[in-house]
Swiss-Prot record:
PANTHER family: RIBOSOMAL PROTEIN S9, SMALL RIBOSOMAL SUBUNIT PROTEIN US9M. This is Small ribosomal subunit protein uS9. InterPro entries: Ribosomal_Su5_D2-typ_SF (IPR020568), Ribosomal_uS9 (IPR000754), Ribosomal_uS9_bac/plastid (IPR023035), Ribosomal_uS9_CS (IPR020574), Ribsml_uS5_D2-typ_fold_subgr (IPR014721). GO terms for biological process: translation. It comes from Syntrophomonas wolfei subsp. wolfei (strain DSM 2245B / Goettingen).
Length: 130
């Protein structure tokens, strides 16, 4: 008999995370690497674990993630959203709690495109009056 597993997809900036929750003892594997190896800084680790801490499900599921694109912050945000969506499938009763804390909301902020005639998206060349 196959194990029960719950899927969730999260996106943030350019990062896309596919998250799988399997009943277990709380191990987190990201791109076949341990959680601590993948996110050496504490801030990213806290971001990823927030939905689990809020719902008190830290030791109930093993989390297996595939994440690509973006940088460290974007990947952490994408995994957070993926975990929240997968937890919602596992237990629909926690929807109000996750929604109130903002874990089910996709952050729409993206990098603004560079415009021609400018150095960056908004940085203009130095202006000389004379």
């Amino acid at each position: 008999m196959a194990k029960v597993q719950y899927w969730g997809t999260g996106r943030r900036k350019e990062a896309v995370a596919r998250v799988r929750l399997v009943p277990g003892e709380g191990n987190i594997i990201i791109n076949n690497r341990s959680f601590e190896d993948f996110f050496p800084n504490q801030t990213s680790r806290l971001i990823v674990q927030q939905p689990l801490v809020l719902t008190a499900m830290q030791g109930r599921f093993d989390i297996i993630c595939r994440v690509n694109g973006g940088g460290v912050s974007g990947q952490a945000g994408a995994i957070q959203l993926g975990i929240a969506r997968a937890l919602l499938k596992a237990n629909p009763d926690i929807k109000a709690m996750l929604r109130r804390s903002g874990f089910l909301t996709r952050d729409p902020r993206m990098k603004e495109r560079k415009k021609y005639g400018l150095h960056k998206a908004r940085k203009a060349p130095q202006y000389s009056k004379r």
